[in-house]
Amino acid sequence: AEALPLASESIDLVFSSLAVQWCARPEHQFAELARVLRPGGCCVFTSLGPDTLCELRAAWAAVDSHQHVNTFLPMAELAAAARRIPGIAVNLERQVLPMAYTQVRDLLDELKALGAHNMNRDSRPGLTSRRALQGMLQAYEAGRREGVLPATYDVIFCFFFKA
């Protein structure tokens, strides 16, 4: 999304679902999206906010100080980056979606199947030990409520329009 292989002002609508958060510089990404949009064009995307997987983050924090869960930009930072692009009107909305799992491993397997890997610079180098993993599983289990384990997804919906 930071270097789209498209001609300038060639697209009426851009739609992206859960890809934008992997771009390192949101202002470059928004400038690139604005470049390819025709006047009157619209971009709609979803991204993840900082409360995403907060339960998993807390469970790992009980084990060590390494960053095991990806961090995501707050909605205000995304909005500020988009508003720095001339000729763009932006509207962002946020929705916190609680998910429920019967086992922590179900959540971990789902994340692995999605291809969600830890992209943080201060993540733990090398493989995670069995002991650390067991510690995280125990810490996460402490959050079990009514037979299920919560997992929060903090979803940001962005709509921006090119004048």
Segments predicted by a language model, with ranges:
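Conserved Class I S-adenosyl-L-methionine
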Residues: A89-A163
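A short glycine-rich, Lys/Arg-flanked "PGG" loop and its adjoining helix->strand segment in the class I
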Residues: E27-C42
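A short acidic, Gly/Pro-enriched loop at the edge of an enzyme's catalytic core
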Residues: E2-V14
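A short SAM/SAH-binding and catalytic strip from SAM-dependent methyltransferases
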Residues: D12-E27, S47
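Conserved catalytic/acceptor-binding region of the Class I
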Residues: R38-V104, H117-P125
